[in-house]
């Protein structure tokens, strides 16, 4: 029996449809409905948001399928779910359930420290994290249809997301301005497929969308990432760990859409209540930095 796979064009096109929007982490049908009402373009179904995963420690796995199913039945917008890096069966289970996207995520404890999933072998599109252009292109080479910065999830601290997005964009500009005869050496340096560098040179951009994620906690954070060139934002703990999730959700969506309307962002930021409590990145031990997972 011939396996039917989704084409890159279709998978990447689905991701393009989320461009300019906000994708929110949710752990229940109620939260999913709040996210949809606030204007989220998609939701990520989890058992625990990243800050709770970080606090609990231990091994973080794919969410209980009952939670994923509950979220899928609660909303009409696309539903994403996370699988562990390299965990073939978690990804196959989520695909069989009919989720719209799978996030091969460093937020969960990696199942394989050497190999990422061969995402081109799945019908469902994948989103993956990256810290630099080399990571981005390796994931695209494996079949990722959408990228996001890794940032440092569950911290409410946007500094790492800023660092990663700026680095990817700086490396993109370098590749775009290279002559063709320099691309093979750069591909070797980045540890990335030559064909993808050639594609970037031709297109003048990444072949897939790149969202910002990891530490976005306020409307201003979301607007900052859009200002820096993100195609949209993921918000993990920032909404449902804030004092007023409904207000924060709506404000972050509006700030993402109107990221250069600073008067509006000022008004959106008033009377929101307390944002989630933030963590200083330098206080995290290396083994506690989720961004270090994967390669």
UniProtKB/Swiss-Prot annotation:
D-glyceraldehyde 3-phosphate binds at residue 166. The lineage of its organism: Bacteria, Pseudomonadati, Pseudomonadota, Gammaproteobacteria, Pasteurellales. In the presence of PdxT, forms a dodecamer of heterodimers. Catalyzes the formation of pyridoxal 5'-phosphate from ribose 5-phosphate (RBP), glyceraldehyde 3-phosphate (G3P) and ammonia. The ammonia is provided by the PdxT subunit. Can also use ribulose 5-phosphate and dihydroxyacetone phosphate as substrates, resulting from enzyme-catalyzed isomerization of RBP and G3P, respectively. GO terms for biological process: amino acid metabolic process; pyridoxal phosphate biosynthetic process; pyridoxine biosynthetic process. PANTHER family: PYRIDOXAL 5'-PHOSPHATE SYNTHASE SUBUNIT SNZ1-RELATED. This is Pyridoxal 5'-phosphate synthase subunit PdxS. D-ribose 5-phosphate binds at residues 25, 154, 215, 236-237. It is an enzyme of class 4 (lyase). It catalyses: aldehydo-D-ribose 5-phosphate + D-glyceraldehyde 3-phosphate + L-glutamine = pyridoxal 5'-phosphate + L-glutamate + phosphate + 3 H2O + H(+). Pathway: Cofactor biosynthesis; pyridoxal 5'-phosphate biosynthesis.
């Amino acid at each position: 029996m011939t396996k039917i796979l989704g084409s890159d064009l279709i998978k990447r096109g689905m991701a393009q449809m989320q461009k300019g929007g906000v994708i929110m982490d949710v752990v229940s049908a109620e939260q999913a409905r709040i996210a949809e009402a606030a204007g989220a373009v998609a939701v990520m179904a989890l058992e625990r948001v990243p800050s709770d995963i970080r606090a609990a420690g231990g091994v973080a796995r794919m969410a209980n399928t009952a939670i994923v199913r509950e979220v899928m039945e609660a909303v009409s917008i696309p539903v994403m779910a996370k699988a562990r890096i390299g965990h073939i069966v978690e990804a196959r289970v989520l695909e069989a359930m009919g989720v719209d996207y799978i996030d091969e995520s460093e937020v969960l404890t990696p199942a394989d420290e050497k190999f990422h999933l061969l995402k081109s072998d799945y019908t469902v599109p994948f989103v993956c994290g990256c810290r630099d252009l080399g990571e981005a292109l390796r994931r695209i080479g494996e079949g990722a249809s959408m990228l996001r910065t890794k940032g440092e999830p569950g911290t409410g601290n946007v500094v790492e997301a800023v660092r990663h997005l700026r680095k990817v964009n700086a490396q993109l500009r370098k590749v775009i301005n290279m002559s063709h005869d320099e691309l093979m050496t750069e591909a070797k340096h980045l540890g990335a497929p030559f064909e993808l560098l050639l594609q970037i040179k031709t297109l003048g951009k990444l072949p897939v969308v790149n969202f910002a994620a990891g530490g976005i906690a306020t409307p201003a954070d979301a607007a900052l990432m859009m200002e820096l060139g993100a195609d949209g934002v993921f918000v993990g703990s920032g909404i449902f760990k804030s004092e007023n999730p409904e207000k924060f959700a709506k404000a972050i969506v509006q700030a993402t859409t109107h990221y250069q309307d600073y008067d509006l962002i000022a008004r959106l930021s008033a009377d929101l209540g307390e944002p989630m409590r933030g963590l200083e990145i330098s206080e995290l031990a290396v083994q506690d930095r989720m961004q270090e997972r994967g390669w």
